[in-house]
Curated annotation (Swiss-Prot):
GO biological process per UniProt: cytochrome complex assembly
Record topology, Cytoplasmic segments: 1-7
Protein name as annotated: Cytochrome c-type biogenesis protein CcmE
A single MF term (Gene Ontology): heme binding
Periplasmic-side positions: 29-134
Alphabetized UniProt keyword annotations: Cell inner membrane, Cell membrane, Cytochrome c-type biogenesis, Heme, Iron, Membrane, Metal-binding, Signal-anchor, Transmembrane, Transmembrane helix
Record function comment: Heme chaperone required for the biogenesis of c-type cytochromes. Transiently binds heme delivered by CcmC and transfers the heme to apo-cytochromes in a process facilitated by CcmF and CcmH.
Binding annotation for heme: H120, Y124
Gene: ccmE
Lineage, highest ranks first: Bacteria, Pseudomonadati, Pseudomonadota, Alphaproteobacteria, Rickettsiales
Main location: membrane
Any one GO cellular component localisation term in the record: plasma membrane
Topology of the protein relative to the lipid bilayer: Single-pass type II membrane protein
Gene3D superfamilies referenced in this protein's UniProt entry, alphabetically: Nucleic acid-binding proteins
Length: 134
């Protein structure tokens, strides 16, 4: 019987270590998932007061205003829109009508972005291939 209990003890310890490892890995992955909210979700929730929110949407045409120290534009999810203020260099794919993800926080009804990521669709093609008929 002694050998049976020792084997059971080893199996329980091994399963416990494995379960603990899975919990740690999933906990670390949770922090790296790039989830974003739409303007409608952000405006209709208590997330407005949280720092480091990611918001995604389309840049509204005709709203991009460039100043000496910042860029101001609106993003929409085709239901609501939010004014975004960004200080920094915009990604090359940023343009009116393009989809972006902005990371930042809400301050006085404006979204102050610390980072802008431009999205492209799955049909992206480099400029050198766009002019050639393939």
């Amino acid at each position: 019987m002694k050998r049976k209990y020792r084997r059971l003890f080893v199996v329980i310890i091994t399963l416990s270590i494995f379960a603990g490892s899975v919990v740690l890995v999933l906990g670390k992955l949770k922090n790296n998932v790039s989830f974003f909210y739409t303007p409608t979700e952000l405006l209709s929730s208590s997330l407005i007061n949280r720092p480091n929110i990611r918001i995604g949407g389309m840049v509204v045409k005709g709203t991009v205003q460039k100043y000496d120290d910042s860029i101001v534009f609106h993003i929409t999810d085709l239901k609501n829109y939010i004014k975004v203020v960004y200080k920094g260099i915009l990604p090359p794919l940023f343009s009116e009508g393009s989809w972006i993800v902005a990371k930042g926080k809400m301050v006085n009804g404006k979204f102050i972005a610390s980072e802008i990521l431009a999205k492209h669709d799955e049909n992206y093609m480099p400029n050198k291939y766009k002019t050639n008929d393939l």
